């Protein structure tokens, strides 16, 4: 059988070399640029969104975990590049669940663009000008748009079906939580009442509740779910391995950490006096940390048995704040003799107060 030759010339593929690099057609460039965009998208996974996906994995059923694990890199690429494949396995089984692709594309009617590590990247739709809905793991949450604060009341209520008695009010009453809020307040230089904002009243019951700072939200989820706590631990290990500086920063932070003991009476008194005198606790100096500093007083708080240490610290810290009145608070004094303590305090101009 004879094969008839075609008079049509084959289409030529344009190619040029620039600085030793072969460059294809515009369409090829488009594909290449698309792949770069893909890499950029993948690199941004080291953000809040990755943790939320991890949380989603830990809270979903075994079948959902299996479905997610079956997605290869090529399948993820297809989902991002093809309009027809924007719906993930989870979406096909539940119309209310929204894929990662749609979350990143539909972040509110205002088309706001947030940093990669901004919690507001989980927004999927607006409720009104001030509030939006988002996806935190498998749960729908409400987010305050101006600052990214999340409705902690709703989050705890949603998860409480699985982890009973895990209400936000329980977390807020926890002594660990109070210490965390205190520390975050000092770190961010924000009043405590600005870290948790209460929204009540109004006709829209969907947006009522307590809205917490994103750092607090992570710890609230950590408190609710042991699985989430484990995932956070692995994320931290991956972060440490990413570069040597990260690991160095991590261990430097550990060296700065102070032991936490909720039964520590000194700590409890410190917080009570802070509220009473409107001062600042744990003021750092070259010689150590001052228990409490107010407009008028330099305060050290100690158990009766450690009164000598308190006097020594007050004398040292007064070098940095010579105009402050030195004040020593002693607790667990009970019926012990304090005459010697009074004499020494008088000699060094220290005001002695007994906490009972």
From Swiss-Prot:
InterPro entries found in the cross-reference section: KilA/APSES_HTH, KilA_N
Composition-biased stretches (Low complexity): 14-46
Biased composition, class Acidic residues, residue ranges: 66-114
Stretches for region Disordered: 1-114
Residue span, KilA-N domain: 130-239
Compositionally skewed regions (Basic residues) per UniProt: 1-12
UniProt protein name: Putative KilA-N domain-containing protein R878
Originating species: Acanthamoeba polyphaga mimivirus (APMV)
């Amino acid at each position: 059988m004879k094969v008839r030759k075609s008079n049509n010339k084959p289409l030529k593929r344009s190619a040029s070399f620039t600085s030793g690099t072969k460059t294809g057609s515009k369409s090829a460039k488009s594909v290449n640029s698309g792949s770069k965009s893909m890499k950029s998208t993948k690199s941004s996974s080291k953000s809040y969104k990755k943790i939320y996906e991890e949380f989603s994995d830990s809270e979903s059923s075994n079948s959902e975990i299996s479905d997610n694990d079956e997605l290869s890199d090529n399948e993820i690429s297809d989902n991002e590049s093809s309009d027809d494949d924007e719906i993930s396995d989870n979406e096909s089984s539940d119309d209310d669940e929204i894929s990662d692709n749609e979350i990143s594309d539909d972040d509110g009617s205002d088309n706001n663009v947030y940093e990669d590590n901004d919690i507001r990247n989980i927004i999927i739709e607006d409720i009104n000008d001030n509030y939006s809905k988002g996806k935190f793991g498998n749960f729908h949450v409400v987010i305050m748009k101006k600052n990214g604060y999340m409705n902690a009341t709703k989050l705890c209520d949603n998860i409480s079906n699985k982890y009973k008695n895990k209400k936000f009010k329980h977390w807020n009453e926890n002594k660990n939580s109070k210490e965390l809020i205190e520390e975050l307040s000092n770190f961010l230089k924000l009043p405590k009442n600005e870290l948790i904002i209460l929204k009540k009243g109004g006709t829209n019951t969907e947006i009522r509740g307590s809205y917490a700072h994103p750092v607090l939200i992570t710890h609230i989820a950590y408190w609710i779910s042991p699985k989430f706590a484990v995932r956070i631990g692995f994320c931290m290990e991956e972060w440490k391995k990413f570069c040597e500086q990260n690991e160095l920063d991590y261990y430097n932070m550990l060296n700065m950490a102070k032991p936490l003991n909720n039964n520590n009476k000194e700590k409890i008194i410190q917080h009570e006096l802070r509220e009473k005198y409107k001062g600042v606790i744990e003021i750092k100096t070259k010689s150590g940390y001052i228990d409490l500093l107010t407009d008028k007083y330099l305060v050290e708080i100690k158990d009766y048995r450690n009164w000598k240490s308190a006097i020594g610290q007050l004398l040292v810290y007064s070098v940095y704040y010579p105009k402050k009145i030195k004040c020593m608070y002693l607790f667990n004094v009970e019926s012990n003799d304090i005459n010697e303590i009074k004499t020494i305090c008088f000699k060094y101009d220290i005001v002695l107060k007994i906490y009972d």
